[in-house]
Amino acid sequence: MRFEGRVYYDFSPQVWRFYRFLAAVGKKGADLRLDWRSFLADDDPQSAAGLALVESVRRNHPDRHGAFLQALLALRHLEDADLTDPRTAAAAAEAAGLADVIEPSPDAVTASTEEGRALGVTGTPTIHRHGPVLRVEVNPAAYEGDLLERLSRIDAVLEDDGIWVLEKPG
């Protein structure tokens, strides 16, 4: 199954859960073609710092962008690393194979957030392909069962512009 779109993200726990779900479906054979875009909805210093670092890597080292994002997400959520600490940026850069010091790019975060808001993004994680955006939050049960079928359901809702809101209590 091919799954594509633009994912608006920050460094929140719900984005980490969604990222882990996507990693799991990728291991099951899904062809993921996702463009990860910064979205700063709240006054969250951790997300603001992390997003500014990732945007700098996107601009200056686009081929290492994904590896750097993955490293920062893991450092934040597996090691509770402080994304405002330059040592965290250095560790993520090393993990991503970057020798440069990463200078934050907060203006790019602002531009990406404004782009997302114009599309209707109000929180993260949100996917945009065409038409209305789809906010997707998964719980730990998302990693069990038929993951590709679950991804197919998400894809079907994303494609159906007649569905605007589906909610199921967590």
Please place each PLM-identified region on the residue numbering:
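Structural alpha/beta surface segment adjacent to cysteine/selenocysteine redox centers
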Residues: 2-87, 164-165
